[in-house]
Amino acid sequence: MALDRSIISKTTWYSVVLWMMVVLVRVHGAAARPNRKEWDSVIKLPTEPVDADSDEVGTRWAVLVAGSNGYGNYRHQADVCHAYQLLIKGGLKEENIVVFMYDDIATNELNPRHGVIINHPEGEDLYAGVPKDYTGDNVTTENLFAVILGDKSKLKGGSGKVINSKPEDRIFIYYSDHGGPGILGMPNMPYLYAMDFIDVLKKKHASGSYKEMVIYVEACESGSVFEGIMPKDLNIYVTTASNAQENSWGTYCPGMDPSPPPEYITCLGDLYSVAWMEDSEAHNLKRESVKQQYKSVKQRTSNFNNYAMGSHVMQYGDTNITAEKLYLYQGFDPATVNFPPQNGRLETKMEVVNQRDAELFLLWQMYQRSNHQSENKTDILKQIAETVKHRKHIDGSVELIGVLLYGPGKGSSVLQSVRAPGSSLVDDWTCLKSMVRVFETHCGTLTQYGMKHMRAFANICNSGVSEASMEEACLAACEGYNAGLFHPSNRGYSA
């Protein structure tokens, strides 16, 4: 039967022709590509819904946390700004994204592009438009917990924005900073302790105010925050940049491959963080599952099985969530609708810097680029010397405390012992905090470098040492030491 074009509008005629072309393409390709999911996206229009059986119900919420400050930690705020822009492109609303960042990077005098933050050597500005919900002194563990729980009464400062989620909503939490066994750093003391965080997640679950939650954590020893204590029945899935015993890594650093623009003297990103975000940007998140991203990020963060310059990405909690599509948490960018499954897969190793050394890395870059005779060069050298001195003091003090508590033959082995996989770091988290406070009172603040000794304090608790004995050992180990700016009276206690 012929179609009478005279009775059909031009727009309708074009629609009919387009429909016929689509049918022909489908018929022609059906035999060669019988799996619908393999070929449907090739002929879809950007405005066409991708999944007819979508499980999308409720609101997507997100909490993004950069847990550090200082230009040497540029990459953490860059990670968070990148995550924000990715979620906005995915359709999440600003009112449903809560951002924690100190906000001392974009306008820092060391930033060669004033007011701009990038997360990739060829990246665009990620800072513009990022909401300043909790900045400066308001980036605290207490505020973070209040935001997650939706408890405005516990907030101190900030925008007042919280996760006011409902039972059908999904939540995505992303954290980037330094860490140590059982802890995550924050720019204002105290640090975030693992059991406190787990307790908050349990409270959130008990409130019945979300359907499912996905958490990504970038930090050294980040697996220890969940290992042995993360329940599987909270409808929460977690991946971490590293296992319970290893470092995570900064990348896109000066003098390395890939390198940032030559005017930059600090690392732009972190290996795990850029791995998951660049993966999300390169894929149709209505097609890619949480599990697929986990596998991709795991491979890239290992630096393709080069664990001397990479780490083991771990997963905890409810792994049933891994079957779901990523868009349920990160949203969907229509521009990615036709991206093929293997789009953007990197197969090359990346040069990296140990997260704990990034601060010294910045100082060394500053020293190298200073004028040979400048007073500034001398000041930088003093900063390097002071930083190294305090690191040696922390390392030496912890080692000596082990000797005083257990004897010269056992001290080191007890403090460095690692529990069996799947075990929690410590039995008594209150004891852990107490031991840290005793140490910091007499020996100075741990700092982001000293976080690595948290396992030693955990083992002191696990072996039954009393607080009085710990006090005595710390007094003997650090007697006469002037912590100066590193004293907790200046920085606060990390516990």
Swiss-Prot record:
Active site: residue positions: H178, C220
Enzyme's top EC category: hydrolase
Coiled coil: none
One GO MF term attached to the UniProt entry: cysteine-type endopeptidase activity
InterPro entries documented for this protein: AE, Legum_prodom, Legumain_prodom_sf, Peptidase_C13
Residues making up the signal peptide according to the UniProt record: 1-32
UniProt site positions, description: Required for post-translational maturation and enzyme activity: C267
Pfam family, one: Legum_prodom
Disulphide bridges, residue numbers: C253-C267, C431-C461, C443-C478
Glycosylation sites recorded in the entry for this protein: N138, N320, N376
Alphabetical keyword list: Disulfide bond, Glycoprotein, Hydrolase, Protease, Signal, Thiol protease
GO cellular component: vacuole
GO annotation (BP), single: vacuolar protein processing
Function according to Swiss-Prot or TrEMBL: Asparagine-specific endopeptidase involved in the processing of vacuolar seed protein precursors into the mature forms.
Family that this chain belongs to: Belongs to the peptidase C13 family.
Protein name: Vacuolar-processing enzyme
Origin species: Glycine max
